[in-house]
Amino acid sequence: MSPLAFVISLPIRFYRKFLGPLLPKVCRFHPSCSTYAMEALEKHGGLKGSWLTLWRLVRCQPFHPGGIDPVP
């Protein structure tokens, strides 16, 4: 993982460790949005991984059907 991707992943790691267990599992996609974000950052680095994550979060809302959405 690039240094930029690592820094960007810190809030995601915090969410997964401390906030995620307290919240209901409501993600419409598989894998979950946080798992997708970590995979995108590891596979594509900080810039493209962040863009893919942002696009995924925009789609994770009640008007999108969700489904299986692997990291490209």
From Swiss-Prot:
UniProt KW Cell membrane keyword: yes
One Pfam family from the record: YidD
**What keywords were assigned to this record?**
Cell inner membrane, Cell membrane, Membrane
| GO cellular component terms, semicolon-separated | plasma membrane
UniProt-annotated location(s): Cell inner membrane
Membrane topology for this entry?
Answer: Peripheral membrane protein
**Where is this protein primarily located?**
membrane
Q: Which family does it belong to?
A: Belongs to the UPF0161 family.
The record, for HAMAP family, names: UPF0161_YidD
What role is this protein assigned? Could be involved in insertion of integral membrane proteins into the membrane.
Protein name per UniProt: Putative membrane protein insertion efficiency factor
Species this chain originates from: Myxococcus xanthus (strain DK1622)
